[in-house]
UniProtKB/Swiss-Prot annotation:
Function, as annotated: Functions in the biosynthesis of branched-chain amino acids. Catalyzes the dehydration of (2R,3R)-2,3-dihydroxy-3-methylpentanoate (2,3-dihydroxy-3-methylvalerate) into 2-oxo-3-methylpentanoate (2-oxo-3-methylvalerate) and of (2R)-2,3-dihydroxy-3-methylbutanoate (2,3-dihydroxyisovalerate) into 2-oxo-3-methylbutanoate (2-oxoisovalerate), the penultimate precursor to L-isoleucine and L-valine, respectively.
Residue numbers carrying N6-carboxylysine: 121
Origin species: Campylobacter fetus subsp. fetus (strain 82-40)
Gene that this polypeptide is encoded by: ilvD
GO terms under cellular component: cytosol
Known EC number: 4.2.1.9
Pathway: Amino-acid biosynthesis; L-isoleucine biosynthesis; L-isoleucine from 2-oxobutanoate: step 3/4; Amino-acid biosynthesis; L-valine biosynthesis; L-valine from pyruvate: step 3/4
Name of the molecule in the record: Dihydroxy-acid dehydratase
Matching PROSITE patterns: ILVD_EDD_1, ILVD_EDD_2
InterPro entries the record matches: Dihydro-acid_dehy_C (IPR042096), DihydroxyA_deHydtase (IPR004404), DiOHA_6PGluconate_deHydtase_CS (IPR020558), ILV_EDD_C (IPR056740), ILV_EDD_N (IPR000581), IlvD/EDD_N (IPR037237)
Length: 557
């Protein structure tokens, strides 16, 4: 056992003495030690109940002959951190979480790992840390939140609350209606109910085989989710000492592609691109961002979920057959798109896991013959405005997939929010929101507030937004993020001026500004960037080490 290094032999007398202080007895030193990486935190709706889930998990682990040791990571709620300087800390928290998992697991030589994430950066952070440790690992999330119910019986979610702000400002709703949405959009614990970043990443864990079936869709705070927790506990005890289930044997080149195929089929959050670029590097199989368009061209988009389709949420996907039904439908269309022989932590191949799954509601999970689009729900655009690429959630486009308009430039998210609220942005404009990339922010803030204001003010089909920052998974509309190179490193987005004409063609995967090479070079010579004052020591460290979005915004020392 890996843990023998801390518990076996006479030289480990002091180590065992310390472990006995935690309650261990003689027999416990013969058992596998299981790390339980929890992310319990009271301020996040998807996490305030995870302490109860970890108790269920640990109890089941003990019953099955292993010794659990729980530790916690930090967490940031992106919705609560949104629209103020707290969002500067969201993406950097991913690195802290990854480092925490690596540190605890390796410092104490634990044999296996169960991760209990749920929201936003916690899932990819734990994946990155687990890949560094490389022991048998199972992910079991807290589960999605149920959708809220509106005054007319319509589905509500967190995005409804953000867009309600713009609707209130333009007097489309009154204060009473605004308060009703506030009080009903998030009715229970769980990761926000649509195909936002958290549920996208939990779904991809299932697609990669590092989580059990149902991980992405079974609702939080249900008996079904509790049983999934117990199953994960029993299974980790079965595989704790089996090298076949080391996480790098589960997450590899084949299963990373499987994840991206599922991502395209379901129109996941654009943040999944950023995180999968980082995760693939930790796994030793770095994704080429340009290659993702090859997947997008091949995979039909068969499932639209909020925010792309506000009436459909994760609970509906669960009832319609779950992720297995989505994967099986894609496999029947073209089995070559997926590595169906890939091993999952349950011991079966991905193909065996999904082969009997059926679509139970074709209004939620479409057949390939009735796909929303013949191409995937995410796209990488290239051109003179983004030589290293940028990302759009094509599934969330409200209007045309082609757009040309005049640039309206803002040098920060705060500037953009004020400008949009004051009516500076009109139909036909392209909002340029820059100096918000990984280095420029620093921290690559999410731009849900500006995009929600645009949609809430009725401009969602008539205005595009491009940024070197990123978007919440709740974002919809013609919103293009992760522009690389970013403005702070001299990227073209930093050279744009008000009135420049920008051409976007999602079907051609292109984004360009109508400027000659001579004009671009002249502007580049004039460009100067002094940088923003950064008071936080941690954010200064992050700014110094972080790479741009085309590399997954990973840290390089």
């Amino acid at each position: 056992m890996r843990s023998d290094i801390i518990k076996d032999g006479y030289t480990r007398t002091p180590h065992r003495s310390l472990l006995r202080a935690t309650g261990l007895k003689d027999d416990d030193f013969k058992k596998p030690f299981i790390g339980v990486a929890n992310s319990f935190i009271e301020i996040i709706p998807g996490h305030f109940f995870l302490n109860k889930y970890s108790e269920i998990l640990k109890d089941e682990i003990r019953k099955n002959g292993c010794v659990p040791f729980e530790f916690n990571t930090i967490g940031v709620d992106d919705g609560i951190a949104m629209g103020h300087e707290g969002m500067l800390y969201s993406l950097p928290s991913r690195e802290i979480i990854a480092n925490s998992v690596e540190t605890v697991m390796n410092a104490h030589a634990l044999d296996a790992l169960v991760c209990i994430p749920n929201c936003d950066k916690i899932v990819p952070g734990m994946l990155m840390g687990a890949l560094r440790v490389n022991v048998p690992t199972i992910f079991v999330s807290g589960g999605p939140m149920a959708a809220g119910v509106g005054a007319k019986g319509e589905a509500l979610d967190l995005n409804s609350a953000f867009e309600a702000v713009g609707a209130y400002e333009t007097k489309q709703i009154d204060e009473k209606e605004l308060k009703f949405i506030e009080c009903n959009a998030c009715p229970s614990g769980g990761s926000c109910s649509g195909m936002f970043t958290a549920n996208s990443m939990n779904t991809l864990c299932e697609a990669m085989g590092v989580a059990l079936e149902g991980n992405g869709t079974v609702l939080a705070l249900t008996s079904e989710r509790e049983e999934l927790i117990r199953k994960a506990a029993r299974r980790i005890c079965e595989i704790a000492l089996d090298e076949r289930y080391q996480i790098r044997n589960i997450i590899n080149e084949k299963t990373i592609k499987n994840a991206m195929v599922v991502d395209m089929a379901m129109g996941g959050s654009s943040n999944t691109i950023l995180h999968m670029l980082a995760i693939s590097r930790e796994a030793g199989y770095p994704l080429d961002i340009a290659s993702l368009n090859d997947i997008s061209r091949s995979v039909p988009h068969i499932t639209k979920i909020a925010p792309s389709l506000p009436s459909v949420h994760m609970q509906d996907v669960a009832k319609a057959g779950g992720l297995s039904a989505v994967i099986n439908e894609i496999a029947k269309f073209n089995s070559d798109l997926l590595s169906l022989d890939a091993l999952t932590v349950s011991g079966e191949s991905l193909g065996d896991r999904v082969k009997n799954a059926e679509i139970l509601d074709e209004s939620v999970i479409h057949t390939v013959q009735n796909a929303y689009s013949k191409v995937g729900g995410l796209a990488i655009l290239f051109g003179n405005l983004a030589e290293q690429g940028c990302v759009i959630k094509a599934a969330g486009i409200i209007g045309s997939r082609q757009f040309s308009g005049k640039a309206v430039c803002f040098n920060s998210q705060d500037e953009a929010i004020k400008g949009i609220s004051k009516g500076k942005v009109q139909k036909g404009d392209v909002v340029v929101l820059r100096y918000e990339g990984p280095k420029g922010g620093p921290g690559m803030q999410e731009m849900l507030s500006p995009t929600s204001l645009i949609v809430g003010r009725g401009l969602g089909a008539d205005v595009a937004l491009i940024t070197d920052g990123r978007f919440s998974g709740a974002t919809r509309g013609l919103s293009i993020g992760h522009v690389s190179p970013e403005a702070a490193e001299g990227g073209m987005i930093g050279l744009l001026k008000d009135g420049d004409i920008i051409d976007i063609d999602v079907d051609k995967f292109s984004i360009n500004v109508r400027l000659s090479d001579t004009e671009i070079e002249a502007r580049r010579k004039e460009w100067k960037y002094a940088g923003k004052p950064v008071n936080s020591r941690w954010l200064r460290q992050y700014q110094k080490l972080v790479t741009n979005a085309s590399n997954g915004a990973i840290l390089e020392a």
